Amino acid sequence: MSEHKKLLKNGMWDNNPALVQLLGLCPLLAVSSTVTNALGLGIATLLVLVGSNVTVSLIRNYVPKEIRIPVFVMIIASLVTCVQLLMNAYAYGLYLSLGIFIPLIVTNCIIIGRAEAYASKNDPLPAALDGFWMGMGMTTVLVVLGAMREIIGNGTLFDGADLLLGEWASALRIQVFQFDSSFLLALLPPGAFIGVGLLIALKNVIDTQLKARQPKQEKPAIERARVTNA
């Protein structure tokens, strides 16, 4: 398996940051009440992941090991500030909706973890691919969870998409069900915990089924040599 395919498989499935590593649960549970919020935070996290991985990889040979963590945090904080300013300028409604969870990306264990575990030990291109696929894995889980909660809670899909994509995206709104009132359990943190648990359980079931379908390799019987004298 090529390195690119291995990074893709790790980020999207085998070592998914949300479903396997269980990192970044605070924003995952708090922000994923709608697809728009989930996608906005996912894109922001992905950009910071790629940027921090590339930057850390470029300077990895010039930073003393004793101060590498503070340096990594400064790099991540700088990139998060840039993303926050861009979102404030071009997606102000979404910026207000996400609130404190944008600057909290600095403390996201996914980002500092990939910087320390992978980017600081590899060249810029593999580091960028690692950040991209880890970010895509996180974004995918965010969007799927956001879609589940939005449909069950409000009966809609892509509500408020214009906050992220512009006024033309208001046409993307889909009314799946018509509710007289919102189903608050799905929209509040308990619903997020239940949703994440269901997604983790589904992944485990799929992994078990895939493992069961793989042909079992029978180990050849090894005959023990006689070591005693006749």
From Swiss-Prot:
Its EC number is 7.-.-.-. It is an enzyme of class 7 (translocase). The chain crosses the membrane at residues 39-59, 69-89, 93-113, 125-145, 182-202. InterPro entries: NqrDE/RnfAE, RnfE. Part of a membrane-bound complex that couples electron transfer with translocation of ions across the membrane. The complex is composed of six subunits: RnfA, RnfB, RnfC, RnfD, RnfE and RnfG. This is Ion-translocating oxidoreductase complex subunit E. It comes from Vibrio vulnificus (strain YJ016). The lineage of its organism: Bacteria, Pseudomonadati, Pseudomonadota, Gammaproteobacteria, Vibrionales. The gene is rnfE.
